Amino acid sequence: MKPAARRRARECAVQAIYSWQLSGNDIADVELEFLSEQDTQGVDIAYFRELLVGVAINAARLDKAMEPYLSRQLEELGQVEKAILRLAMFELSFREDVPYKVAINEAIELAKVFGADDSHKFVNGVLDKAAPTVRKK
């Protein structure tokens, strides 16, 4: 699969995870609505689905895994930061075929696109600390 298709899958997944976090709707409904309303040309749809459903199913586990590395309470995170961190923690935890440096870099790039001004620095700091524990380098 082309790296660009995976990057687009991550971008779409972060948006859908964000929507799910805010709405509280069933993940299948969020997925269906997202795919019917958004431009998904050039997106690795299978990877998008894996990320979205994987994060939803494992959200509590992912949150618990990242909590020791947060400089503030999980509840104080912005929803965009939380969506990006959950996605990256999912990749670090469940997708060993994705090099940890790629997972971290992709999360930083997502934070630059979707996050507040310095959220990419926060995301980088959390993931740099979490990666050695979550996945043996």
Curated annotation (Swiss-Prot):
Listed Pfam families: NusB
SUPFAM superfamilies named in the record: NusB-like
InterPro entries on file: NusB-like_sf, NusB_fam, NusB_RsmB_TIM44
Keyword Transcription in record: yes
Key words, A-Z: RNA-binding, Transcription, Transcription antitermination, Transcription regulation
Any one Gene Ontology BP term: transcription antitermination
CC terms in the record's Gene Ontology section: cytosol
Molecular function terms from GO: RNA binding
PANTHER family linked to this entry: ANTITERMINATION NUSB DOMAIN-CONTAINING PROTEIN (PTHR11078:SF3), N UTILIZATION SUBSTANCE PROTEIN B-RELATED (PTHR11078)
Family named by the database record: Belongs to the NusB family.
HAMAP family with a match to the protein in the record: NusB
Annotated NCBIfam families: nusB (TIGR01951)
The protein's role, per its UniProt record: Involved in transcription antitermination. Required for transcription of ribosomal RNA (rRNA) genes. Binds specifically to the boxA antiterminator sequence of the ribosomal RNA (rrn) operons.
Stated name of the protein: Transcription antitermination protein NusB
Organism (species): Proteus mirabilis (strain HI4320)
Protein's gene: nusB
